Amino acid sequence: LYLNFYKDFIMSTESDTVSDTASLFEQMRKKLKGVIPDFEIELKAKYAQEIIQLKKEKNAIILGHNYMEPALYHSIPDYVGDSLFLSSVASKTEADIIVFCGVWFMGETAKILNPTKTVLVPSREAGCSLAEGISRNDLIELKKKFPGVPVVSYVNTYADTKAESDYCCTSGNAGKVLSH
């Protein structure tokens, strides 16, 4: 259901039809003209073409979060969207490797949802200030201070924090979870 709702956000990079860097450059240029200078698009098209080739060779799927760098966003992902949508895609993929171009907790969530797959996050430093707002240790201390109080964590937290929580919610279902 979630995938059907967000079908308008699914983006094909047309990578199956892009056989060379020049074609990819033109495809990217159409989307990025006036946003990124041509010389930068040309350089990034070369990198993107290499990534697309590796993706095919390794049977990988690339998931791109909405906050990705524009040139890569418009060239390499098989799907783009928010973290919840992309996690849903990750849970259903047949690909051997999931490359999650997003922040660290998104890759962790993909691994939780599809534990037999290899999940890669291109940058270990890709953090989220929201997820950094509370650590597992912080939560353990709060649970000691307030024993018996159910803990509800937001989906945008790290896996170790979620593991210490009683419930995990999204912005869309927080009200229902809290009234439970």
Where are these regions (language model features)?
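Short, Lys/Arg-enriched N-terminal segments with co-localized hydrophobic residues
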Residues: 1-10
